[in-house]
Amino acid sequence: MNQLLTFYPNRIIIIRKWCESAKSYFVGTYLKGICIMENNVIILAGGQGKRMKTNMPKALCNVIGEPMLEWVLTACENAELDDICVVKGYEGQQIEDYLARRKSKADICTVMQEERLGTGHAVMQAADFLKAHAEGNTLILYGDAPFIDAETIKGALELHTEKDCGVTVVTSRVENPTGYGRIIRTENGISGIVEHKDCTPMQLAITEINSGCYWFKTADLLEVLFDIKPENAQGEYYLTDCIELLIAKGKKADAFISANPHVALGANDRRGLLALNDIARYEIIGKWLDEGIEFCCTDGVSIGNNVTIGHGTKIHSGVILRGNTTIGENCNIGNNCIIENTTVGNGVNLNNVQAYESVIEDDVKIGPYVQLRPNSHIKKGAKIGDFVEIKNSTIGEYTAVAHLTYIGDSDVGSNVNFGCGVVTVNYNGDKKFRTVIEDNAFIGCNTNLVAPVRVGKGAYTAAGSTITTDIPDNALAIERGRETIKEGYAEKKLKARTEKFEAIHGKSEEK
């Protein structure tokens, strides 16, 4: 081969290109000849949850700072499902608004369920979605059952496709199955689901329960969906009736037992929602303990489902980590920090910090009592001290903002030093303007920088100055009134105050 490369390099290249072209041709031709199955999902999120006593859909009630619907959407996206249809109902516009704000990985559409007439009726509203994806499989699950996970979804789909099932029910084994539908198994799969109130004494002993999560062959589901009848006391259309109809048509039905013991859990009232929060909090902290993260005390600690934490990091009491937050390695997250949708680098030390939608680079020290408002970027090695607020600003490498300072709408260079009490005056009552402070500048105590203004490289501002014009590189700017001294002024003021006091209260007796 080496000789060929030496004497016929161009021919080798031609042969290689021909092989790559042939491979693309054969692979492309093969794919055109087969049907690629889509795996899509319908999420039922139309419930009101009257016992929650809230004016929002139940699926938007929070578990560890995230709507239950978000937990479900995240699981579906992590399972790499294709398209998602959310069935909305009560206060459906709130569902629309939430999805519009969300950065989704999958394509998401919504349909409206005007009347809440059961789970089967909810799925009927998504009939057009089902017909558009009739060649694949469809997962149906509740938007207010937050503990469904990607591993369960993928495991159930694998069983569903391997056994060529018309329907596969996701189930769980629990110690106390009270209130849940029981799974009736046969040698070839399952024969049905019996609701708790309809169970015989023998069926009540069954501990395998229905999670309310189902994989259907989409075409099979469409075949029976509109055959279900509201023949029950509630006058509702039950999706579970589709299982019996499919079995009656000779379709195979089976059940996948999830390793997740909480997969079926939901909440109907505030007590139930609090219980879900406690479970989620305990499970997530346990996961990070297993990853080697040190928790000095778990009191008040809350970590969101989408948070990641690097090795060697220490978490103290009262810490709340929410949203798409990433904490790097060997960090110290001190007491009472709230970090939301923020990226934190390695070796960062935070103490009583609130940070929202910001970036904190490596080896930064912040706190105590610091707020980073959205779009703040603190670069490597910077130090932000007590009682500082930063908003929509970049703080350069190794810059020090020691205390009692407001920096808003500013671009700050590296190795800048801020004295105590500096304010970037960014708002004139109508518009906001930016302040630029270049590398190695020194901003004296109680300086007001009235934007738009630029402080040049290496420039100084004298303490107490109000800066309204640009400062050249390496210059000193002093903008304050000259000090005036009035001799004897205090004695005159004291005499006047004494006379006024005596006129009101009388002359004091001399001792």
Regions found by a protein language model. Give the residues of each.
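Conserved N-terminal catalytic core of the sugar/cofactor nucleotidyltransferase
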Residues: 30-40, 66-141, 147-158, 162, ...
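Structural signal for interior beta-strand "rungs" in well-ordered beta-sheet cores
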Residues: 294-478, 483-484
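Conserved alpha/beta core of the MobA/IspD/sugar-nucleotide pyrophosphorylase nucleotidyltransferase superfamily
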Residues: 207-310
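N-terminal nucleotide-binding beta1-loop-alpha1 segment
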Residues: 37-54
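Short, positively charged and aromatic/hydrophobic N-terminal segments
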Residues: 6, 12-14, 20-29, 33-34
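Short catalytic helix/loop segments, enriched in acidic residues and glycine
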Residues: 55-71
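Conserved core of the sugar-phosphate nucleotidyltransferase
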Residues: 93, 148-233, 240
